[in-house]
Amino acid sequence: MAHPHQHLLTLFLTDDNGFYSYLSEKSDDEALEDINTIKKYMDFILSVLIRSKEKLENIGCSYEPMSESFKALIKVKDDGTLVKAFTKPLLNPHSEKIVLDRGYTSDFAISVIRLSSKSSYILPANTKYINPNENMYINNLISLLKRN
């Protein structure tokens, strides 16, 4: 019997836009609930990766940034303010059919679900947006960057 999140996680992990098509058919509340479910599993996977990276570093293996190929999400403007910097174009959620991969991606999704349910990893609380103008740490960081 399939876990209730198996198909959702498989859709998300598949390298196409089917996940967006799926979300576009849901109500806002259902879509948000599904996104939070995905976020929970991504937090778990990131936790596993970070702990694994730390193990490599503990034995002297230098492991360069794991997110090297990603675009910047924020940038610092000349006046020191942080702004979002999205470079990906908008997508049409109805442009692709929903195809559920029943191969290795589905197997991986099942494994993540099972491993996360038995794991002793303590995951961080839900991430919240921080307004850079109201955060003293970020303001101090910006002032240091402005001086240099």
Swiss-Prot record:
Q: For this UniProt entry, which residues form the secretion signal?
A: none
Q: What is its main location?
A: virion
What's any one GO cellular component for it? virion component
The keyword Transferase appears for this protein:
no
Keywords for the protein's UniProt record, in alphabetical order: Host cytoplasm, Late protein, Virion
Q: InterPro entries under this entry?
A: Poxvirus_J1 (IPR005006)
Superkingdom, natural source: Viruses
Q: Where does the UniProt annotation locate this protein?
A: Virion; Host cytoplasm
Its induction note reads: Expressed in the late phase of the viral replicative cycle.
In the record, the note on similarity to other proteins reads: Belongs to the chordopoxvirinae J1 family.
Function description: Late protein which is a part of a large complex required for early virion morphogenesis. This complex participates in the formation of virosomes and the incorporation of virosomal contents into nascent immature virions. J1 protein is required for DNA packaging during immature virions (IV) formation.
* Complex and partners: Homodimer. Part of a complex composed of A30, G7, F10 kinase, A15, D2, D3, and J1. Interacts with A45.
User: What's this protein's name?
Assistant: Protein J1 homolog
